[in-house]
């Protein structure tokens, strides 16, 4: 319908309406006092005239002029601030506006009239309210005509009723828009979510307008209405009523009375503010298209509206992130980071609550609660106590809500005051929102603010004045001029320890103490870039350096004046010339760069270098400042052996005389760090920032590749300090010196793939092999020997820890301990922390060790050299990948590694498969003597479960813990925590008893009454009692054979690469053995020929000169000593490959001999030649006897036979021999350990039995106290579909997670309620697992006491590493017999090595009242067999042959089963082969069942790979 008056024609009103057709309601007919008072003269309307001026001059005012009564309309115009706010322009205030000219939202300082803005807003809110009255409403049109001073607001949807009010005798549109104190919101019993409340609203807009036009059309009343008011609602025109079309709408057009607002026109500020309000409505009104000046506002919803704000800002260059959530139909909330204190944008029923209110507090408080716990956890190491308002200061909250009957602090409705309980709805933020909120940057912003606050506190501790004398800093040797006017010329020397300080002080004697100060650092400086402020504030070295240098945190030192406040003008680092010394230099540079980068740019930092090697010959002295420089000199100097070589591993090696020499040649030893631009800044940041992990990886990877290439090309290593080096850039220092420490840090932390060792472990093994001790040796003594033999330059305490770790054999440590633990080396009680002092415990090589590292391999390894001393090899080469046998953990620079343990016997089989050219079988983590269960979640994760069983309605028994969960920690952190109660919850457990030993676990736990039933209904007991963990294989990082770090995706990949390296060594070993045997054979042949020639007088040596003897032997074609020559060739080959030259005793003697004492070259040559034939001429005369002659000839023939045997053998044969020898020795060693463990358990049980009170009756079983109870109902751990799907989803790429959900495995069969067939109570997943075992290729001898299952999965990629203590949620599991836990093993191979066994004879059923006698070390029948055999069948089922690959069955114990409730007879068909031996548990009503006791393995056979099981060992109940 058109807006023009011409379209309205005067027609008769509808019959049902009583108002006259065209008659205007005169003022006389209006009975309302307020309306009568609305008829005023021009003088009456001039309400802004000052009352004080009415009287004029000084004439005293009349009482009537002082005390006046005003009408409602007069009061509104006279005191507008009560109703619409101020009518004065505000001061320039930052506000969000929409710039219509540039079409963008912006925040700028504006000045506007709040009253004018309010009357516009009242009309806009009315339009938005109509959406609540009529959900079909979908359009709002806003027009702001600046030139005409005209604003219109149109909305469709249900119009105003066009009918006469029967009480007030006026039309309803006129009543609600032209009569004060009228409203539809006076019924407080009606719950409304609209903006109107007090009955002013649009009337205020009418009153403050020179013209106000209302147009509405009502489809229900089939009429359209139009009326105009002028002169501040004091005059109104006749309403025009016409028949309407089918359209419903309402339109308000008004011209604000600018004079009342002291304005001449609608300025840009108010227009832009009104435009932004239009955008508010568009964002807060769902399903409504809003048009502004004819153009649709492009906002689809509240989230789009929020992004319109946040897109104006960024966080460290990235767009601001938002967390958004719609809660129900009435709440929409969003959160973003605020850098300007707490900000909020909120709407209540479309009203813009610019000052917030209780709705904003309600939402913001929830958001703060989400953050405060995580932030407090991060601040645990600091002294800061964060408050909620401090978090709130970094939040930008957006709220759009619908509130029932809201109340406000004033008519301006800027603050909502309604209490939260009256909102009519709740807004509970979800975990999904919390997760999104954690990524918007608020936590980081709060932490940054905390650091700033702490920095401010730190700065308060800094000295504000420059002083020449300092007190309270121990060991400081202050420069005399420090802190004076000459302080810029002073240099502070930071030394690495007290010994280096002594060296520096000695050197100062030649340069003076006026300009140089010395301060020793204790160890390595803190990495301040990643340390928290509390660490920095508490760090003595940092505080001392700041005080000595006169630094202040708040100063940047960018100006000369600031720089002059320092006590020293230079900082010089004097550290050892090794990698750790480089790290100290880097940390000092990092300290200055982090807080005062401008000092780095001023070249404030220097270093003092000292020689690492000196070569001396007479008065000539050559100094070398890096090992590569020394190696290069040695290669280019023919007579280098004539020099005396001395290595300087630390500054303490230098003498005071040498210190003076260093300081005299300050030009050579003083190296300045030169700033060379942003590249230097980036290099320092990359080396020390936690955020640059990936960059550090790339940096180190590139360096390792370059090192490998140079090595392959035979090039020397690069070094930083040449003879003419006077300065280095920070980038060069990081890339060419600091990188050496970072690589060394990785070598110390991450093992090598080939031998699985870190350098310390390799040194220990090298020393043990070299010592070849036949007797046990004290650990402390062995550590000292290792340091001496292998040139170990660090503390021996670390070596002692390494030795102890190599000898530990408790569950979760080593699968094969290479050293024997003779004494207390730690147990699973405290994870090895309970080991005795190294002074009291002994060790020696394990018999298994040399079978893993054959002595023959020592001849083909590449040994390292240090200080001309042959030390450990680059890596050993065991016969199987030891890194998989014992696992590995470590955190280096840029990388970390975590590799679980695997079964050595399975590794032997995989190696044999590779030798035979067959593919490997999949491996699962395996830990020696672990009685729990390991189930595969996906290709890179395994769930590790402990063991729990139910003893009665309120008692459970825990007999195994997950890997790496130590007994003492479990008791303190889990069980004691479950004993705590709260007001709302009773404790889970009331008591527990401990029966474990140092090798076994047993907790008997008493639960609160009824708690067990409650837990079983809701959760898995493994979850409740923290008996589950996750083992990840996603972080398997190792050094390869070439010394480069690589990431491996599976143990099979590691085995394959190991196989390639090991194969090459077997080829080399064969070549070496052939060479040495051939040399020995040749030597014996020469000796035999020489003896025969001497006997036959063909050789006469008596009374001849040495030279003549040599000539005779050469003439008769006797070879120079073949063995000696061959060994010398091998030694030279090794030295050439290593790039080192080892000085033997002759070389060392030659160096000490002066030139004038040297023997002639001719005589020396004769001596050398004669020594080559000493093996002939040096033989004893007894060798000429017939017996010795024949013995020599026989030895020669035997040696030739050995050569022929070796020639026939392939490298495969050599490897097979080593593997078989290893397995044989391992079996013997484990048998000895098992015997010792059984004896230990038996002794412990006897002690417990003796201590217990015993009554009359049969003797108590001594093993029941420490071993699993025979009557326990084992809870079978299972991985349910939901958990598996969770990990599959975690491992998918982000895009794939949305599009494609992982395929869930089939749900296990559910346990039926009582009355079902008892066989259904067994573990539902067992039959499926058994079927998969064969296809997956598992072998039952993988473990006798662990349980490993593989489930199908997809290939994933994950960054998780380590054994995580995680809730692997699974459904409640059925219970099975306790004994089944100890031998459930999955066969990882297809080898049919276990022969089928005949079924065992049937067993008799026991009376039900008698408890089943479980063997604590026995297993039961397989679950697969149970499904095939009903236990309640009336007819006895025929015996079936055992499956081909089934485990051997054994005789049963008497009274194996419990009889039925009706009688004590044996159930029909229940024998060992046909009955699963399930009986209904006493607590049958709960729906649980108990698996009957397992059988003893009395006389079972064994295959070649599995040692014969002893009586009482477990029968594998689930393997094929």
UniProtKB/Swiss-Prot annotation:
ATP binds at residues 126, 155, 183-185, 196-203, 411-413. GO terms for biological process: cell division; DNA topological change; mitotic sister chromatid segregation; mitotic sister chromatid separation; resolution of meiotic recombination intermediates; sister chromatid segregation. Mg(2+) 2 binds at residues 576, 578. InterPro entries: DNA_Topoisomerase_II, HATPase_C_sf, Ribosomal_Su5_D2-typ_SF, Ribsml_uS5_D2-typ_fold_subgr, Topo_IIA, Topo_IIA-like_dom_sf, Topo_IIA_A/C_ab, Topo_IIA_A_a_sf. Its EC number is 5.6.2.2. The record marks 891 as: Important for DNA bending. Disruption phenotype: RNAi-mediated knockdown results in embryonic lethality. Disrupts proper hcp-3 localization on mitotic chromosomes indicating unresolved kinetochores and inhibits centromere resolution. Causes a chromosome segregation defect during the first embryonic mitotic divisions without affecting cytokinesis. Leads to increased localization of the condensin component capg-1 to the spindle midzone and the midbody and to chromatin bridges with enriched levels of capg-1. Increased levels of phosphorylated air-2 at the spindle midzone, indicating activation of the abscission checkpoint. It comes from the Eukaryota. Belongs to the type II topoisomerase family. This is DNA topoisomerase 2 top-2. It comes from Caenorhabditis elegans. The gene is top-2.
């Amino acid at each position: 319908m058109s807006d023009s008056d011409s379209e309205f024609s005067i027609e008769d009103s509808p019959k049902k309406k009583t108002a006259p057709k065209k008659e205007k309601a005169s003022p006389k007919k209006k009975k309302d006092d307020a309306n009568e008072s609305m008829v005023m003269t021009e003088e009456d309307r001039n309400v802004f005239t000052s009352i004080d001026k009415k009287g004029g001059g000084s004439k005293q005012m009349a009482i009537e002029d002082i005390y006046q009564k005003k009408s409602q309309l007069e009061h509104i115009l006279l005191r507008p601030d009560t109703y619409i706010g101020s009518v004065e322009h505000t001061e320039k205030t930052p506000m969000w506006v929409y710039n219509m000219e540039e079409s963008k939202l912006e925040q700028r300082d504006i000045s506007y009239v709040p009253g004018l803005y309010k009357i516009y807003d009242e009309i806009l809110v009315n339009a938005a309210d109509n959406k609540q009255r009529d959900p079909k409403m979908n359009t709002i049109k806003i027009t702001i005509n600046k030139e005409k001073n005209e604003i219109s607001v149109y909305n469709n949807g249900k119009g105003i009723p066009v009918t006469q009010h029967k009480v007030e005798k006026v039309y309803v549109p006129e009543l609600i828009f032209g009569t004060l104190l009228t409203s539809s919101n006076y019924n407080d019993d009606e719950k409304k979510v609209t903006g109107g409340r007090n009955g002013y609203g649009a009337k205020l807009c009418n009153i403050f307008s020179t013209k106000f036009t209302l147009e509405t059309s009502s489809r229900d009343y089939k009429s359209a209405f139009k009326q105009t008011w002028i002169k501040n609602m004091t005059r109104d025109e006749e309403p025009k009523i016409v028949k309407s079309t089918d359209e419903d709408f309402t339109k308000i057009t008004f011209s604000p009375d600018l004079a009342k607002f002291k304005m001449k026109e609608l300025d840009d500020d108010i227009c832009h503010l009104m435009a932004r309000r239009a955008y508010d409505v568009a964002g807060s009104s769902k399903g409504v298209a809003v048009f502004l000046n004819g153009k649709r506002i492009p906002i689809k919803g509240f989230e789009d509206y929020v992004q319109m704000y946040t897109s104006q800002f960024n966080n460290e260059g990235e767009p601001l992130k938002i967390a958004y959530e719609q809660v129900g139909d009435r709440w929409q909330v969003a959160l973003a980071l605020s850098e300007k204190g707490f900000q909020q944008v909120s709407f209540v029923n479309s009203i813009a609550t610019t000052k917030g209110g209780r709705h904003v507090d309600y939402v913001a408080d929830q958001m703060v609660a989400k953050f405060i716990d995580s932030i407090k956890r991060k601040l645990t190491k600091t002294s800061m106590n964060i408050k909620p308002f401090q978090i709130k200061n970094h939040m930008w909250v957006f709220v759009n809500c619908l509130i029932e009957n809201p109340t406000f602090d004033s008519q301006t409705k800027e603050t909502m005051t309604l209490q939260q309980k009256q909102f009519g709805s709740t807004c509970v933020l979800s975990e999904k929102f919390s997760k999104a909120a954690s990524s918007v940057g608020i936590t980081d912003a709060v932490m940054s603010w905390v650091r700033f606050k702490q920095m401010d506190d730190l700065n308060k501790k800094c000295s504000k004045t420059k002083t020449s004398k300092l007190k309270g800093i121990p060991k400081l040797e202050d420069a005399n001029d420090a802190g004076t006017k000459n302080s810029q010329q002073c240099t502070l020397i930071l030394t690495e320890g007290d010994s280096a300080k002594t060296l520096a002080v000695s050197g100062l004697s030649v340069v003076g103490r006026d300009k140089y100060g010395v301060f020793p650092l204790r160890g390595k400086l803190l990495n301040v870039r990643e340390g928290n402020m509390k660490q920095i504030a508490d760090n003595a070295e940092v505080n001392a350096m700041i005080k000595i240098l006169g630094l202040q945190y708040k100063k940047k030192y960018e100006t000369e004046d600031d720089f002059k406040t320092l006590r020293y003008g230079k900082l010089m680092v004097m550290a050892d010339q090794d990698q750790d010394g480089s790290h100290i230099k880097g940390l000092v540079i990092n300290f200055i760069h982090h807080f005062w980068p401008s000092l780095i740019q001023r070249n404030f930092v220097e270093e003092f270098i000292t020689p690492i090697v000196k070569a001396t010959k007479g008065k000539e002295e050559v100094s070398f400042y890096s090992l590569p420089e020394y190696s290069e000199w040695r290669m280019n100097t023919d007579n280098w052996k004539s020099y005396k070589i001395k290595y300087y591993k630390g500054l303490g090696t230098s003498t005071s005389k040498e210190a003076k020499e260093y300081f005299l040649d300050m030009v050579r030893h003083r190296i300045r760090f030169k700033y060379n631009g942003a590249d230097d800044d980036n290099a320092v940041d990359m080396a020390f920032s936690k955020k640059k992990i990936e960059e550090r990886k790339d940096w180190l990877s590139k360096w390792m590749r370059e090192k490998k290439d140079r090595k392959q090309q035979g090039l020397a290593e690069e070094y930083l300090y040449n003879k003419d080096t006077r300065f280095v850039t920070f980038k060069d220092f990081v890339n060419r010196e600091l990188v050496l420490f970072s690589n060394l840090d990785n070598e110390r932390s991450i093992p090598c793939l080939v031998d699985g060792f870190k350098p310390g472990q390799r040194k220990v093994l090298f020393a043990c092999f070299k010592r070849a001790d036949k007797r046990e040796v004290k650990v402390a003594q062995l550590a000292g020997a290792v340091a001496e033999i292998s040139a170990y330059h660090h503390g021996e305490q670390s070596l002692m820890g390494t030795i102890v770790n190599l000898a530990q054999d408790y569950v979760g440590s080593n699968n094969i301990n290479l050293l024997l633990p003779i004494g207390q080396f730690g147990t699973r009680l405290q994870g090895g922390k309970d080991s005795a002092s190294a002074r009291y415990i002994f060790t020696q090589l394990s018999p298994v060790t040399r079978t893993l590292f054959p002595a023959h391999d020592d001849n083909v390894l590449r040994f390292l050299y240090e200080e001309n001393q042959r030390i450990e090899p680059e890596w050993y080469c065991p016969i199987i990948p030891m890194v998989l046998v014992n696992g590995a953990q470590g955190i280096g620079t840029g990388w970390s590694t975590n590799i679980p343990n695997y079964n050595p016997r399975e590794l032997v089989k995989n190696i044999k498969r590779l030798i035979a050219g067959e593919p490997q079988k999949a491996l699962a983590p395996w830990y020696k003597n672990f009685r729990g269960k390991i189930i595969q979640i996906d290709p890179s994760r395994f769930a590790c479960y402990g063991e729990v069983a139910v003893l009665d309605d309120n008692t459970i028994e825990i007999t195994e813990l997950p890997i790496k969960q130590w007994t003492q920690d479990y008791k303190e952190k889990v069980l004691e925590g479950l004993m705590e109660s709260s007001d709302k919850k009773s404790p889970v457990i009331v008591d527990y008893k401990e029966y474990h030993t140092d090798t076994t676990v047993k907790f008997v736990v008493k639960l609160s009454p009824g708690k067990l039933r409650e837990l079983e209904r809701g959760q898995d007991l493994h979850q409740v009692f923290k008996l589950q963990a996750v083992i990840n294989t996603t972080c398997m990082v190792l050094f390869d054979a070439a010394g480069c770090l690589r990431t491996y995706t599976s143990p099979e990949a590691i085995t394959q690469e190991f196989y390639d390296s090991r194969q090459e060594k077997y080829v080399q070993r064969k070549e070496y053995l052939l060479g040495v045997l051939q040399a020995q054979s040749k030597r014996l042949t020469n000796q035999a020929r020489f003896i025969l020639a001497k006997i036959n007088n063909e050789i006469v040596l008596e009374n001849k000169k040495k030279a003549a003897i040599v000539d005779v032997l050469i003439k008769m074609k006797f070879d120079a000593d073949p063995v000696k020559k061959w060994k010398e060739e091998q030694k030279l080959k090794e030295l050439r490959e290593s790039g080192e030259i080892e000085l033997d005793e002759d070389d060392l003697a030659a160096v000490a001999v002066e030139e004038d004492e040297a023997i002639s070259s001719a005589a020396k040559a004769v001596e050398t030649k004669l020594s080559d034939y000493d093996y002939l001429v040096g033989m004893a005369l007894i060798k000429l006897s017939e017996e010795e002659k024949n013995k020599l000839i026989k030895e020669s023939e035997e040696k030739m036979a050995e050569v022929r045997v070796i020639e026939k053998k392939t490298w495969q044969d050599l490897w097979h021999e080593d593997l078989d020898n290893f397995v044989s020795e391992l079996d013997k060693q484990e048998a000895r350990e098992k015997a010792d463990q059984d004896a230990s358990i038996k002794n412990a049980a006897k002690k417990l039995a003796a201590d217990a009170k015993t009554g009359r009756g049969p003797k108590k079983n001594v093993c029941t106290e420490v071993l699993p109870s025979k009557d326990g109902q084992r809870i079978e751990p299972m991985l349910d579909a939901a958990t598996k799907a969770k990990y599959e989803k975690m491992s998918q790429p982000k895009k794939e997670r949305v599009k494609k959900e992982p395929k869930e495995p089939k749900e296990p069969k559910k346990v039926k309620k009582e009355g079902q067939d008892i066989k259904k109570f067994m573990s539902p997943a067992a039959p499926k697992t058994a079927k998969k075992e064969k296809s997956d290729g598992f072998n039952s001898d993988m473990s006798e006491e662990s349980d490993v299952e593989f489930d199908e999965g997809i290939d994933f990629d994950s960054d998780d590493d380590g054994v995580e203590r995680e809730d692997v949620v699974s459904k409640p599991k059925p219970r099975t017999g306790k004994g089944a836990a100890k031998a459930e093993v999955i066969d990882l191979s297809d080898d049919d090595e276990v022969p089928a066994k005949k079924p065992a004879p049937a067993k008799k059923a026991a009376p039900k009242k008698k408890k089943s006698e479980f063997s604590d070390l026995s297993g039961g029948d397989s679950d697969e067999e149970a499904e095939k055999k009903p236990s309640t069948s009336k007819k006895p089922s025929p015996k079936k042959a055992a499956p081909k690959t089934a485990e051997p069955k054994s005789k049963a114990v008497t009274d194996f089963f419990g009889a039925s409730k009706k009688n004590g007879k044996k159930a029909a068909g229940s024998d060992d082969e046909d009955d699963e031996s399930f009986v209904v548990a006493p607590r049958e009503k709960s729906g649980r069942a108990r698996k009957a006791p397992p059988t003893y393995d009395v006389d079972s056979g064994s295959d070649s790979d599995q040692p014969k099981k002893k009586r009482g060992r477990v029968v594998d109940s689930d393997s094929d």
